[in-house]
Protein backbone atom coordinates (compact mmCIF):
# COMPACT_ATOMS: atom_id res chain seq x y z
CA UNK A 1 0.00 0.00 0.00
CA UNK A 2 1.21 3.48 -0.85
CA UNK A 3 -0.26 6.44 1.01
CA UNK A 4 0.01 10.21 0.87
CA UNK A 5 -1.67 13.18 2.52
CA UNK A 6 -2.21 16.58 0.94
CA UNK A 7 -3.16 19.41 3.26
CA UNK A 8 -5.97 21.50 1.72
CA UNK A 9 -6.87 23.85 4.59
CA UNK A 10 -6.61 24.03 8.35
CA UNK A 11 -7.68 20.65 9.72
CA UNK A 12 -8.69 19.46 6.24
CA UNK A 13 -6.92 17.40 3.62
CA UNK A 14 -7.01 14.49 1.19
CA UNK A 15 -5.59 11.03 1.81
CA UNK A 16 -4.66 9.08 -1.31
CA UNK A 17 -3.97 5.37 -0.92
CA UNK A 18 -3.79 2.22 -2.99
CA UNK A 19 -5.35 -1.19 -2.42
CA UNK A 20 -3.13 -4.01 -3.63
CA UNK A 21 -4.05 -7.13 -5.58
CA UNK A 22 -3.43 -9.23 -2.46
CA UNK A 23 -6.51 -7.55 -0.95
CA UNK A 24 -8.52 -7.05 -4.15
CA UNK A 25 -8.57 -10.70 -5.29
CA UNK A 26 -10.03 -12.14 -2.04
CA UNK A 27 -12.59 -9.30 -2.00
CA UNK A 28 -13.63 -10.10 -5.59
CA UNK A 29 -13.99 -13.77 -4.64
CA UNK A 30 -16.14 -12.82 -1.67
CA UNK A 31 -18.29 -10.51 -3.82
CA UNK A 32 -18.75 -13.26 -6.43
CA UNK A 33 -19.70 -15.87 -3.83
CA UNK A 34 -22.26 -13.44 -2.44
CA UNK A 35 -24.15 -13.03 -5.73
CA UNK A 36 -23.62 -16.36 -7.50
CA UNK A 37 -26.23 -18.17 -5.41
CA UNK A 38 -28.90 -16.00 -7.04
CA UNK A 39 -27.61 -16.26 -10.62
CA UNK A 40 -29.82 -18.00 -13.17
CA UNK A 41 -27.85 -18.71 -16.36
CA UNK A 42 -29.11 -21.19 -18.99
CA UNK A 43 -27.04 -24.35 -18.99
CA UNK A 44 -25.96 -24.05 -15.36
CA UNK A 45 -27.65 -24.94 -12.11
CA UNK A 46 -28.64 -21.94 -10.01
CA UNK A 47 -25.72 -20.93 -7.82
CA UNK A 48 -23.18 -23.07 -9.72
CA UNK A 49 -21.97 -20.71 -12.43
CA UNK A 50 -18.16 -21.03 -12.80
CA UNK A 51 -16.23 -17.83 -12.24
CA UNK A 52 -14.59 -17.78 -15.70
CA UNK A 53 -18.00 -18.04 -17.38
CA UNK A 54 -19.31 -15.24 -15.15
CA UNK A 55 -16.38 -12.99 -16.10
CA UNK A 56 -16.94 -13.79 -19.77
CA UNK A 57 -20.68 -13.10 -19.73
CA UNK A 58 -20.90 -10.18 -17.29
CA UNK A 59 -17.38 -8.86 -16.85
CA UNK A 60 -15.40 -8.83 -13.62
CA UNK A 61 -16.06 -5.10 -13.29
CA UNK A 62 -19.62 -5.68 -12.05
CA UNK A 63 -18.07 -7.05 -8.84
CA UNK A 64 -15.93 -3.98 -8.18
CA UNK A 65 -18.45 -2.01 -6.14
CA UNK A 66 -19.20 -4.87 -3.74
CA UNK A 67 -15.53 -5.78 -3.52
CA UNK A 68 -14.60 -2.19 -2.72
CA UNK A 69 -17.18 -2.08 0.07
CA UNK A 70 -15.59 -5.23 1.49
CA UNK A 71 -11.98 -4.09 1.40
CA UNK A 72 -12.32 -0.32 1.85
CA UNK A 73 -12.85 0.03 5.65
CA UNK A 74 -9.68 -1.85 6.59
CA UNK A 75 -7.67 -0.18 3.81
CA UNK A 76 -8.79 3.28 4.89
CA UNK A 77 -8.00 2.60 8.56
CA UNK A 78 -4.56 1.28 7.58
CA UNK A 79 -3.86 4.42 5.55
CA UNK A 80 -4.89 6.68 8.43
CA UNK A 81 -2.69 4.70 10.83
CA UNK A 82 0.30 4.76 8.45
CA UNK A 83 0.02 8.54 8.09
CA UNK A 84 -0.53 8.92 11.86
CA UNK A 85 -3.54 11.19 11.36
CA UNK A 86 -6.12 12.00 14.02
CA UNK A 87 -9.18 11.89 11.77
CA UNK A 88 -12.62 12.99 12.94
CA UNK A 89 -15.99 12.70 11.18
CA UNK A 90 -16.78 10.46 8.23
CA UNK A 91 -14.49 10.76 5.18
CA UNK A 92 -15.72 11.57 1.69
CA UNK A 93 -14.48 8.68 -0.46
CA UNK A 94 -13.74 8.96 -4.18
CA UNK A 95 -12.41 6.32 -6.57
CA UNK A 96 -9.38 7.60 -8.48
CA UNK A 97 -8.85 4.47 -10.54
CA UNK A 98 -10.08 0.87 -10.61
CA UNK A 99 -8.50 -1.01 -13.50
CA UNK A 100 -8.43 -4.75 -13.99
CA UNK A 101 -5.20 -6.31 -12.82
CA UNK A 102 -3.92 -3.08 -11.27
CA UNK A 103 -3.94 -1.72 -7.73
CA UNK A 104 -6.98 0.43 -6.99
CA UNK A 105 -6.35 4.06 -6.09
CA UNK A 106 -8.70 5.76 -3.65
CA UNK A 107 -8.90 9.28 -2.24
CA UNK A 108 -10.57 10.36 0.98
CA UNK A 109 -11.37 13.93 1.98
CA UNK A 110 -10.88 14.02 5.73
CA UNK A 111 -11.21 16.35 8.69
CA UNK A 112 -8.48 16.13 11.31
CA UNK A 113 -8.42 17.08 14.96
CA UNK A 114 -7.43 20.70 15.47
CA UNK A 115 -4.17 21.73 17.08
CA UNK A 116 -4.53 22.60 20.76
CA UNK A 117 -2.14 25.17 22.20
CA UNK A 118 -2.28 24.64 25.93
CA UNK A 119 -2.20 27.53 28.36
CA UNK A 120 -1.93 27.30 32.14
CA UNK A 121 -3.65 24.25 33.56
CA UNK A 122 -1.84 23.80 36.87
CA UNK A 123 -1.99 25.95 40.02
CA UNK A 124 -5.21 27.54 38.85
CA UNK A 125 -7.28 29.81 41.12
CA UNK A 126 -11.06 29.53 40.81
CA UNK A 127 -14.18 30.87 42.48
CA UNK A 128 -17.22 28.69 43.13
CA UNK A 129 -20.62 29.45 44.58
CA UNK A 130 -20.93 26.04 46.21
CA UNK A 131 -20.33 25.85 49.95
CA UNK A 132 -19.42 23.00 52.26
CA UNK A 133 -21.25 24.60 55.18
CA UNK A 134 -24.49 22.99 56.31
CA UNK A 135 -26.95 25.34 58.03
CA UNK A 136 -29.60 24.52 60.60
CA UNK A 137 -32.18 25.72 58.06
CA UNK A 138 -31.04 23.09 55.55
CA UNK A 139 -31.29 20.32 58.14
CA UNK A 140 -34.74 21.52 59.19
CA UNK A 141 -35.86 21.75 55.55
CA UNK A 142 -34.84 18.12 54.92
CA UNK A 143 -36.81 16.97 57.95
CA UNK A 144 -39.78 19.10 56.90
CA UNK A 145 -39.84 17.45 53.47
CA UNK A 146 -39.97 14.04 55.12
CA UNK A 147 -42.65 15.31 57.49
CA UNK A 148 -44.78 16.49 54.57
CA UNK A 149 -44.35 13.10 52.90
CA UNK A 150 -45.90 11.50 55.98
CA UNK A 151 -48.87 13.87 55.91
CA UNK A 152 -52.34 12.40 55.53
CA UNK A 153 -55.18 13.85 53.46
CA UNK A 154 -58.30 14.30 55.58
CA UNK A 155 -61.72 15.18 54.15
CA UNK A 156 -63.01 18.52 55.41
CA UNK A 157 -66.28 20.44 55.11
CA UNK A 158 -64.76 23.91 54.97
CA UNK A 159 -63.95 25.72 51.73
CA UNK A 160 -60.78 24.77 49.88
CA UNK A 161 -57.64 26.84 50.43
CA UNK A 162 -54.33 26.75 48.59
CA UNK A 163 -52.49 23.55 49.47
CA UNK A 164 -55.71 21.57 49.83
CA UNK A 165 -56.54 18.73 47.45
CA UNK A 166 -59.88 18.71 45.65
CA UNK A 167 -61.41 15.66 43.97
CA UNK A 168 -63.16 16.88 40.83
CA UNK A 169 -64.96 16.01 37.62
CA UNK A 170 -64.43 18.44 34.77
CA UNK A 171 -65.55 18.87 31.18
CA UNK A 172 -63.78 21.44 29.01
CA UNK A 173 -65.16 23.20 25.95
CA UNK A 174 -64.15 25.92 23.51
CA UNK A 175 -66.99 27.96 22.01
CA UNK A 176 -69.40 25.42 23.47
CA UNK A 177 -67.71 22.43 21.81
CA UNK A 178 -65.98 19.79 23.93
CA UNK A 179 -62.41 18.91 22.91
CA UNK A 180 -60.26 15.79 23.20
CA UNK A 181 -58.42 15.45 26.50
CA UNK A 182 -60.62 18.04 28.22
CA UNK A 183 -62.57 15.64 30.41
CA UNK A 184 -61.73 13.97 33.72
CA UNK A 185 -63.47 12.15 36.56
CA UNK A 186 -62.50 11.86 40.23
CA UNK A 187 -59.28 13.69 39.53
CA UNK A 188 -57.24 14.66 42.60
CA UNK A 189 -55.79 18.16 42.19
CA UNK A 190 -53.61 19.92 44.74
CA UNK A 191 -54.43 23.62 44.58
CA UNK A 192 -51.30 25.66 43.93
CA UNK A 193 -49.36 22.74 42.46
CA UNK A 194 -49.45 24.17 38.93
CA UNK A 195 -50.66 20.90 37.43
CA UNK A 196 -53.34 22.61 35.36
CA UNK A 197 -53.13 25.60 33.03
CA UNK A 198 -52.72 29.03 34.68
CA UNK A 199 -55.84 30.32 36.41
CA UNK A 200 -57.63 26.99 36.77
CA UNK A 201 -56.56 26.11 40.29
CA UNK A 202 -56.96 29.66 41.61
CA UNK A 203 -60.67 29.62 40.75
CA UNK A 204 -61.27 26.51 42.85
CA UNK A 205 -59.98 28.18 46.00
CA UNK A 206 -63.05 28.81 48.16
CA UNK A 207 -65.15 25.99 46.71
CA UNK A 208 -66.80 23.30 48.82
CA UNK A 209 -67.79 19.69 48.26
CA UNK A 210 -70.94 19.42 46.14
CA UNK A 211 -70.41 22.70 44.29
CA UNK A 212 -70.24 23.02 40.51
CA UNK A 213 -68.35 25.95 39.01
CA UNK A 214 -67.59 27.18 35.52
CA UNK A 215 -63.84 27.74 35.44
CA UNK A 216 -62.90 30.25 32.72
CA UNK A 217 -59.32 30.06 31.44
CA UNK A 218 -57.24 30.86 28.36
CA UNK A 219 -54.77 28.33 27.00
CA UNK A 220 -51.20 29.67 26.73
CA UNK A 221 -50.03 30.75 23.27
CA UNK A 222 -47.31 28.07 23.39
CA UNK A 223 -49.67 25.28 24.48
CA UNK A 224 -48.60 21.93 23.02
CA UNK A 225 -51.99 21.26 21.41
CA UNK A 226 -51.83 23.84 18.64
CA UNK A 227 -55.61 23.78 18.01
CA UNK A 228 -56.15 25.03 21.60
CA UNK A 229 -53.23 27.46 21.93
CA UNK A 230 -54.37 30.97 22.84
CA UNK A 231 -58.08 30.05 22.98
CA UNK A 232 -60.54 30.78 25.79
CA UNK A 233 -62.09 27.70 27.38
CA UNK A 234 -64.73 26.85 29.96
CA UNK A 235 -64.37 23.89 32.30
CA UNK A 236 -67.58 22.82 34.03
CA UNK A 237 -66.09 21.55 37.28
CA UNK A 238 -67.81 19.61 40.05
CA UNK A 239 -66.09 19.35 43.43
CA UNK A 240 -66.73 16.01 45.14
CA UNK A 241 -64.35 16.32 48.10
CA UNK A 242 -62.03 18.82 49.70
CA UNK A 243 -59.09 17.37 51.60
CA UNK A 244 -56.53 19.09 53.77
CA UNK A 245 -53.11 17.88 54.80
CA UNK A 246 -52.60 16.79 58.37
CA UNK A 247 -48.90 16.64 59.11
CA UNK A 248 -47.51 14.79 62.12
CA UNK A 249 -46.05 16.72 65.04
CA UNK A 250 -42.37 17.59 64.93
CA UNK A 251 -41.18 15.35 67.75
CA UNK A 252 -39.24 12.20 68.61
CA UNK A 253 -42.05 9.97 67.34
CA UNK A 254 -41.80 11.64 63.94
CA UNK A 255 -38.04 11.06 63.95
CA UNK A 256 -38.55 7.34 64.57
CA UNK A 257 -41.18 7.16 61.82
CA UNK A 258 -38.75 8.78 59.40
CA UNK A 259 -35.73 6.67 60.35
CA UNK A 260 -35.97 3.56 62.50
CA UNK A 261 -32.27 3.82 63.35
CA UNK A 262 -32.78 6.93 65.51
CA UNK A 263 -34.63 7.43 68.78
CA UNK A 264 -34.91 11.20 69.00
CA UNK A 265 -35.36 14.26 66.81
CA UNK A 266 -31.90 15.47 67.79
CA UNK A 267 -30.37 12.19 66.61
CA UNK A 268 -32.19 12.55 63.29
CA UNK A 269 -30.89 16.10 62.90
CA UNK A 270 -27.34 14.96 63.61
CA UNK A 271 -27.63 12.13 61.08
CA UNK A 272 -29.07 14.41 58.41
CA UNK A 273 -26.35 16.97 59.06
CA UNK A 274 -23.66 14.34 58.36
CA UNK A 275 -25.45 13.24 55.19
CA UNK A 276 -25.77 16.82 53.97
CA UNK A 277 -22.13 17.51 54.79
CA UNK A 278 -21.04 14.50 52.74
CA UNK A 279 -23.27 15.52 49.83
CA UNK A 280 -22.05 19.12 49.98
CA UNK A 281 -18.44 17.95 50.05
CA UNK A 282 -19.02 16.04 46.82
CA UNK A 283 -20.92 18.95 45.25
CA UNK A 284 -18.16 21.38 46.27
CA UNK A 285 -15.43 19.17 44.80
CA UNK A 286 -17.45 18.77 41.59
CA UNK A 287 -17.91 22.53 41.35
CA UNK A 288 -14.19 23.16 41.87
CA UNK A 289 -13.31 20.52 39.27
CA UNK A 290 -15.77 21.98 36.79
CA UNK A 291 -14.50 25.52 37.31
CA UNK A 292 -10.86 24.43 37.01
CA UNK A 293 -11.49 22.51 33.79
CA UNK A 294 -13.44 25.46 32.38
CA UNK A 295 -10.53 27.78 33.16
CA UNK A 296 -7.98 25.37 31.65
CA UNK A 297 -10.09 25.27 28.47
CA UNK A 298 -10.37 29.06 28.42
CA UNK A 299 -6.58 29.35 28.79
CA UNK A 300 -6.02 27.06 25.78
CA UNK A 301 -6.27 27.94 22.11
CA UNK A 302 -7.98 25.55 19.72
CA UNK A 303 -7.02 26.25 16.12
CA UNK A 304 -10.26 26.34 14.10
CA UNK A 305 -12.61 23.80 15.65
CA UNK A 306 -14.16 21.81 12.76
CA UNK A 307 -17.94 22.13 12.69
CA UNK A 308 -18.17 18.41 11.89
CA UNK A 309 -16.93 17.60 15.40
CA UNK A 310 -19.72 19.67 16.92
CA UNK A 311 -22.34 18.11 14.63
CA UNK A 312 -21.16 14.60 15.51
CA UNK A 313 -21.34 15.41 19.22
CA UNK A 314 -24.89 16.75 18.84
CA UNK A 315 -26.03 13.55 17.12
CA UNK A 316 -24.18 11.36 19.64
CA UNK A 317 -25.86 13.14 22.56
CA UNK A 318 -29.30 13.03 20.92
CA UNK A 319 -28.99 9.32 20.13
CA UNK A 320 -27.87 8.61 23.69
CA UNK A 321 -30.79 10.59 25.13
CA UNK A 322 -33.34 8.94 22.85
CA UNK A 323 -31.87 5.53 23.64
CA UNK A 324 -32.36 6.20 27.36
CA UNK A 325 -35.96 7.29 26.71
CA UNK A 326 -36.73 4.15 24.71
CA UNK A 327 -35.26 1.95 27.46
CA UNK A 328 -37.87 3.57 29.72
CA UNK A 329 -40.60 2.71 27.22
CA UNK A 330 -40.91 6.23 25.79
CA UNK A 331 -40.69 6.49 22.00
CA UNK A 332 -39.34 9.66 20.34
CA UNK A 333 -42.85 10.49 19.12
CA UNK A 334 -44.28 10.11 22.63
CA UNK A 335 -41.47 12.23 24.14
CA UNK A 336 -42.03 15.11 21.72
CA UNK A 337 -45.79 14.94 22.29
CA UNK A 338 -45.44 14.93 26.08
CA UNK A 339 -42.96 17.81 26.14
CA UNK A 340 -44.53 19.84 23.36
CA UNK A 341 -41.17 20.03 21.58
CA UNK A 342 -39.76 18.90 18.24
CA UNK A 343 -36.62 17.14 17.09
CA UNK A 344 -35.35 20.52 15.90
CA UNK A 345 -35.84 21.94 19.42
CA UNK A 346 -33.82 19.08 20.91
CA UNK A 347 -31.11 19.57 18.27
CA UNK A 348 -30.79 23.27 19.16
CA UNK A 349 -30.61 22.44 22.87
CA UNK A 350 -27.75 19.99 22.38
CA UNK A 351 -26.02 22.20 19.84
CA UNK A 352 -25.56 24.91 22.47
CA UNK A 353 -23.81 22.39 24.76
CA UNK A 354 -21.87 20.38 22.17
CA UNK A 355 -19.34 23.09 21.31
CA UNK A 356 -18.28 23.33 24.96
CA UNK A 357 -18.05 19.54 25.39
CA UNK A 358 -15.93 19.07 22.27
CA UNK A 359 -13.51 21.83 23.28
CA UNK A 360 -13.26 20.43 26.80
CA UNK A 361 -12.45 16.93 25.53
CA UNK A 362 -9.82 18.27 23.13
CA UNK A 363 -8.04 20.23 25.85
CA UNK A 364 -8.09 17.32 28.34
CA UNK A 365 -6.75 15.00 25.62
CA UNK A 366 -3.98 17.52 24.90
CA UNK A 367 -3.06 17.67 28.59
CA UNK A 368 -2.95 13.87 28.79
CA UNK A 369 -0.63 13.82 25.77
CA UNK A 370 1.56 16.63 27.13
CA UNK A 371 1.92 14.79 30.45
CA UNK A 372 2.63 11.49 28.70
CA UNK A 373 -0.15 9.68 30.50
CA UNK A 374 -0.71 6.02 29.64
CA UNK A 375 -2.78 3.32 31.26
CA UNK A 376 -1.11 0.29 32.81
CA UNK A 377 -2.57 -3.22 32.58
CA UNK A 378 -3.37 -3.02 36.29
CA UNK A 379 -5.29 0.24 35.82
CA UNK A 380 -7.27 -1.23 32.93
CA UNK A 381 -8.22 -4.28 35.01
CA UNK A 382 -9.24 -2.05 37.92
CA UNK A 383 -11.39 0.07 35.60
CA UNK A 384 -13.12 -3.03 34.22
CA UNK A 385 -13.81 -4.35 37.72
CA UNK A 386 -15.06 -0.96 38.93
CA UNK A 387 -17.46 -0.69 35.98
CA UNK A 388 -18.68 -4.24 36.54
CA UNK A 389 -19.45 -3.39 40.17
CA UNK A 390 -21.08 -0.06 39.31
CA UNK A 391 -23.42 -1.54 36.69
CA UNK A 392 -23.83 -4.96 38.35
CA UNK A 393 -22.51 -6.78 35.29
CA UNK A 394 -20.17 -9.76 34.90
CA UNK A 395 -16.55 -8.70 34.46
CA UNK A 396 -16.21 -10.60 31.19
CA UNK A 397 -19.27 -8.89 29.77
CA UNK A 398 -17.76 -5.48 30.51
CA UNK A 399 -14.51 -6.63 28.94
CA UNK A 400 -16.26 -7.58 25.69
CA UNK A 401 -18.31 -4.38 25.56
CA UNK A 402 -15.38 -1.99 25.98
CA UNK A 403 -12.26 -1.99 23.84
CA UNK A 404 -8.83 -1.73 25.42
CA UNK A 405 -8.17 1.47 23.47
CA UNK A 406 -11.33 3.06 24.86
CA UNK A 407 -10.36 2.15 28.41
CA UNK A 408 -6.82 3.46 27.92
CA UNK A 409 -8.23 6.73 26.60
CA UNK A 410 -10.65 7.12 29.52
CA UNK A 411 -7.95 6.40 32.11
CA UNK A 412 -5.58 8.92 30.51
CA UNK A 413 -8.37 11.52 30.51
CA UNK A 414 -9.04 10.90 34.22
CA UNK A 415 -5.35 11.39 34.98
CA UNK A 416 -5.38 14.67 33.04
CA UNK A 417 -8.34 15.91 35.08
CA UNK A 418 -6.48 14.98 38.28
CA UNK A 419 -3.50 17.07 37.13
CA UNK A 420 -5.80 20.07 36.70
CA UNK A 421 -7.57 19.66 40.03
CA UNK A 422 -4.82 18.48 42.38
CA UNK A 423 -3.14 21.92 42.47
CA UNK A 424 -6.21 24.14 42.10
CA UNK A 425 -6.82 26.85 44.69
CA UNK A 426 -10.23 28.19 45.66
CA UNK A 427 -10.35 31.96 46.07
From Swiss-Prot:
Signal peptide: none
Compartment(s): Cytoplasm
Main location: cytoplasm
A single GO cellular-component term on record: cytoplasm
GO biological process, one term: protein transport
Catalytic activity, reaction form: [protein]-peptidylproline (omega=180) = [protein]-peptidylproline (omega=0)
Gene Ontology MF terms in the entry: peptidyl-prolyl cis-trans isomerase activity; protein folding chaperone; ribosome binding
Keywords: Cell cycle, Cell division, Chaperone, Cytoplasm, Isomerase, Rotamase
Residues in PPIase FKBP-type domain copies: 163-248
Domain of life: Bacteria
InterPro entries: PPIase_dom_sf, PPIase_FKBP_dom, Trig_fac, Trigger_fac_C, Trigger_fac_C_sf, Trigger_fac_ribosome-bd_bac, Trigger_fac_ribosome-bd_sf, Trigger_fact/SurA_dom_sf
Top class in the EC scheme: isomerase
EC number: 5.2.1.8
Pfam families: FKBP_C (PF00254), Trigger_C (PF05698), Trigger_N (PF05697)
The keyword Protein biosynthesis belongs to this UniProt entry's keyword annotation: no
Keyword Lyase: no
HAMAP family according to UniProt: Trigger_factor_Tig (MF_00303)
Free-text domain note: Consists of 3 domains; the N-terminus binds the ribosome, the middle domain has PPIase activity, while the C-terminus has intrinsic chaperone activity on its own.
Sequence similarity: Belongs to the FKBP-type PPIase family. Tig subfamily.
Function: Involved in protein export. Acts as a chaperone by maintaining the newly synthesized protein in an open conformation. Functions as a peptidyl-prolyl cis-trans isomerase.
Protein's recorded name: Trigger factor
Organism, as annotated: Streptococcus uberis (strain ATCC BAA-854 / 0140J)
Amino acid sequence: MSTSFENKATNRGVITFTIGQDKIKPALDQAFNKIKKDLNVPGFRKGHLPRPIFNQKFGEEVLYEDALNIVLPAAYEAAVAELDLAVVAQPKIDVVSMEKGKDWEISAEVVTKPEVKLGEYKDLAVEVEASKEVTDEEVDAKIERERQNLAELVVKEDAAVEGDTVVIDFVGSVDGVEFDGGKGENFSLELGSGQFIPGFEDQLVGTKAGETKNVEVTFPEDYQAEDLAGKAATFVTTVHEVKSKEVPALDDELAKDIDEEVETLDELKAKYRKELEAAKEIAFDDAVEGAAIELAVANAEIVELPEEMVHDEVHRAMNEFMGNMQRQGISPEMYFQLTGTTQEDLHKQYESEADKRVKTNLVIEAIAKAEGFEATDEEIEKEINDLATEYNMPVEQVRTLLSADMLKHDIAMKKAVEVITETVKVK
